A protein has these predicted regions:
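Acidic, divalent-metal-binding catalytic cores of TOPRIM
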Residues: 334, 340-545
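Switch/communication elements of ASCE P-loop NTPase nucleotide-binding domains
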Residues: 1-49, 250-374, 390-391, 400, ...
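Extended helical coiled-coil dimerization/tether regions that scaffold
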Residues: 192-275, 279-291
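Conserved nucleotide-binding/hydrolysis micro-motifs of P-loop NTPases
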Residues: 97-99, 123-128, 157-158, 298, ...
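Short glycine-/polar-rich loops that comprise or flank the Walker A/P-loop
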Residues: 87-91, 113-118, 146-149, 168-170, ...
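Electropositive, glycine-dotted interaction segments
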Residues: 90, 97-218
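Conserved catalytic network of the ASCE P-loop NTPase/AAA+ motor domain
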Residues: 82-86, 110-113, 144, 281-287, ...
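Conserved P-loop NTP-binding catalytic core
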Residues: 43-112
Length: 545
């Protein structure tokens, strides 16, 4: 059994409805910061356990789990006297597989399909309708009235759901989880407890009670308590200090994990991440879990340590009938775990490489540099034909804005001419801001025909020189194409200016172009590093707007 689909409405990052189809085995969710990766992981865990950030959601409702835009729209409308529907959070998990249980099968889901699954809804409790009407008729509503909300957790057949009843178990691995007040790690403490059977827990509880007895029986503590009793005039009852044993599981809050006699929280973050992951995948609950969730396993890890961790993950989860859902923005993680399981995320837009044309999918699977992720992880991509174009565009951006494009989240990617359309296919499906900087090669009509599907796009721009340079120049007895980067740079500047920047002397344009043709990258690097500024062709200026 596995999760076939996740449906989310108005939860944190996602405004309105968001659907994500999942693979039955491995899913690698890739997106930039704030893309919604963590929201998906948290939504799945919440719907399966009723727990959000270490607390049961029924006991810790707050307005911040609602999408902020939805809440703001509600407040604007209700305070303007308009009809305002109270926001609602809904998370649905659709189960599938041969062993999908009939227990939660029904039609009460967003698909209205006969499916097995669970829903968790956070919505207005109609029992408070009168109180709510009084509230909105009074003073201005400043925040979502969360005190009138309730949590509903049910199967698609309307039966109430609990984590015990849901047959699909889940383990969440988050290497950046919080700490207990005593400094120990919540996450690793829970993992170790999960590995203890009931007899072990009894033994630890008894040992901890023995520590309390030893503490209370210590002569120094007795003397202190006698002093407190003698100086207190607050009550007739005896006052003293001791170890807190008010809870049957009081020992848990005092649990401190050690590694080679060093407190766990004092070892390196990378080592912590690996130990947490290994313990979590190997503990009893994870062994029985059908779904394993991992948030950004690359955090704090070096290249070598990341290799070790990925190897362990693959070994542990292969052929073990587990569904693994990993969020990451590391190209290394995605590449190692498998491009075919990649899910690209940009807001509410998702894309699998399998949804691309077959030749495009095959192309990206063979890419060693993994520029696919560079495209999705930037605010805007400028696609250029090669390294020399990349250097010149970066310098043009620096001259105009006083900083490199990457500092503004703009990535200049050498896509090479033949792969422009492949990158644009991804940008188009994900609604990514992208710009192509290309030569017209002396045939503007052919270029327009090539990019005809994107010439009127709202988020994709094709930048090129609309004028064909008909200059007749021969180099080595061959006609020279004057509609490329180097001639365009020369046209925007003088012979002397270009010579000064590249540190060479030439008497004719032909000699300069001949040199630049054979030393493209060297000349571009000289332009990039030069203290002198030059002029740039208009199509490059258009690209950096």
């Amino acid at each position: 059994m596995y999760i076939r689909k996740v449906h989310i409405e108005n939860f944190k990052k996602f405004k309105g409805a968001f659907d994500l189809e999942l693979n039955s085995d491995l899913n690698i969710i890739v997106g930039d910061n704030e893309a919604g990766k963590s929201t998906i992981i948290e939504a799945i865990f919440l719907a399966l356990t009723g727990i959000f950030r270490n607390r049961y959601i029924r006991n810790d409702l707050n307005s911040y789990i609602f999408n902020k835009d939805v809440v703001d729209e509600y407040l604007t409308n209700v305070n303007a006297g308009h009809k305002a529907n109270l926001p609602k959070v809904l998370i649905e998990l659709f189960f599938d597989g041969e062993d999908a249980p009939p227990i939660f099968r029904g039609l009460h889901n967003s698909e209205s399909s006969d499916s097995s699954g669970v829903s968790l809804a956070i919505e207005f409790d109609e029992r408070f309708k009168e109180e709510y009407e009084v509230l909105i008729r009074g003073k201005e509503v400043q925040s979502l009235p969360i005190e009138y909300y309730e949590v509903k957790w049910y199967g698609f057949n309307w039966d109430n759901a609990t984590s015990r009843l849901i047959p699909l178990k889940v383990a969440l691995i988050d290497s950046d989880n919080g700490k207990l007040p005593n400094g120990s790690d919540i996450y690793i403490s829970r993992i170790i407890k999960d590995n203890l059977d009931s007899d072990d827990v009894v033994k630890i509880t008894q040992a901890f009670r023995g520590l309390q007895d030893d503490f209370s029986g210590n002569q120094s503590v007795k003397d202190i308590n006698d002093g407190i009793k003698g100086s207190s005039g607050i009550t007739n009852k005896e006052i003293g200090i001791s170890v807190d044993m008010s809870s049957r599981n009081a020992w848990e809050s005092f649990l401190m994990t050690y590694l080679d006699n060093i407190p766990f929280t004092y070892i390196g973050k990378g080592e912590q991440a690996i130990i947490k992951t290994n313990l979590a995948l190997g503990n009893k609950k994870a062994s029985n879990a059908g779904v394993i969730l991992m948030e950004e396993p690359e955090n704090h890890l070096s290249h070598t340590k990341m290799n070790e961790l990925i190897s362990y993950i693959k070994h542990h989860c292969e052929d073990k009938d587990k569904q693994l859902i990993i969020s990451t923005h590391s190209s290394f993680v995605a590449n190692k775990l498998g491009l075919s399981r990649l899910i690209l995320l940009n807001g509410t837009n998702t894309l699998r490489l399998s949804e691309l044309k077959k030749d495009t999918e095959a192309y990206f699977e063979s890419l060693p540099g993994y520029n696919t992720l560079r495209l999705i992880l930037c605010k805007k991509a400028i696609l250029v034909e090669g390294p020399s174009d990349e250097l010149v565009v970066q310098r043009a951006y620096l001259d105009k804005n006083g900083k490199l494009p990457i500092e503004d989240g703009v990535d200049v990617i050498s896509a090479y001419n033949l792969s422009f359309l492949r990158f644009l296919e991804i940008a188009d499906k994900l609604k990514l801001a992208a710009c192509v900087v290309t030569d017209n090669d002396g045939n503007v009509n052919a270029l327009k025909d090539k990019y005809k599907d994107y010439l009127h796009s709202d988020h994709i721009r094709i930048c090129y020189d609309e004028t064909v340079n008909s200059s007749s120049i021969e180099i080595d007895d061959k006609a020279y194409n004057c509609n490329t980067l180097e001639p365009n740079l020369l046209n925007a500047n003088s012979l002397d200016e270009i010579c000064k920047v590249i540190g060479k002397e030439f008497n004719t344009n032909e000699d300069l172009l001949n040199y630049m043709k054979g030393h493209k990258t060297d000349c571009a690097l000289a332009i990039f590093k030069s203290k002198e500024k030059i002029n740039y062709p208009q199509y490059i200026l258009d690209a950096i707007q």
